Amino acid sequence: PIAGSMVLAAILLKLGGYGIIRMMQVLPTTKTEMFLPFLVLALWGAILANLTCLQQTDLKSLIAYSSISHMGLVVAAIIIQTPWGLSGAMALMVAHGFTSSSLFCLANTTYERTHTRILILTRGFHNILPMATTWWLLANLLNIATPPSMNFTGELLIMSALFNWCPTTIILLGLSMLITASYSLHMFLSTQMGPTALSNQTAPMHSREHLLITLHLIPLMLISMKPELVI
């Protein structure tokens, strides 16, 4: 069910990140070197989740693995226990909560019309539902973390904190962000561009669907203008 996916991606997954932040306050801040294996594991996990996204044919699975890869960055930022790392983790959790939930919502609008989640069978929607294509483009740009979005602020803070702590992490971070951009563009092009595979008539997007996406993206854009509300 779509509601379950949206709540899981937007709230429950981020509650895990919040739990890690609370737990880290109990542990010593002076010996962050002991957390190095966990940090490498978190970043490597993010890269593996991104690579899994690239080979997905199921739209919903792709978005779910995308959430996991972003949480890998969040965990890595929390582990080093610096103010910038924690601020970046909070910013990315809030921003990606809105983004992944809106992507799940868009995936459901596509599924309701095509009755399939296979990427190659949902193509050609830019001719049929141009407004939905606009929403897909905005959501994917936010997923890539294009400036001046909150996603970009969060990832920039995380990158700065990790690079300051250990310059070698920039290789893993850079690779992760490159693959994120690749699968996001792949998802957009696969679902929206090319000739349509549909033979029957497609129902237009309902006002409630437009409202649902708007209520995800507008608050995120407003928070992006005033990030001190979160970080």
Swiss-Prot record:
Gene Ontology terms for molecular function: NADH dehydrogenase (ubiquinone) activity; ubiquinone binding
Query: Can you say where in the cell this protein is located?
Result: Mitochondrion membrane
* Entry membrane topology: Multi-pass membrane protein
Annotated TM spans: 1-21, 34-54, 63-85, 89-111, 128-148, 156-176
Cellular component GO terms, alphabetical: mitochondrial membrane
Question: Which domain of life does this protein belong to?
Answer: Eukaryota
Report if keyword Membrane is assigned: yes
Give GO BP annotations, semicolon-separated.
ATP synthesis coupled electron transport; electron transport coupled proton transport
Q: Name the chemical reaction catalysed here.
A: a ubiquinone + NADH + 5 H(+)(in) = a ubiquinol + NAD(+) + 4 H(+)(out)
Its annotated function is as follows: Core subunit of the mitochondrial membrane respiratory chain NADH dehydrogenase (Complex I) that is believed to belong to the minimal assembly required for catalysis. Complex I functions in the transfer of electrons from NADH to the respiratory chain. The immediate electron acceptor for the enzyme is believed to be ubiquinone.
Its recorded name reads: NADH-ubiquinone oxidoreductase chain 4
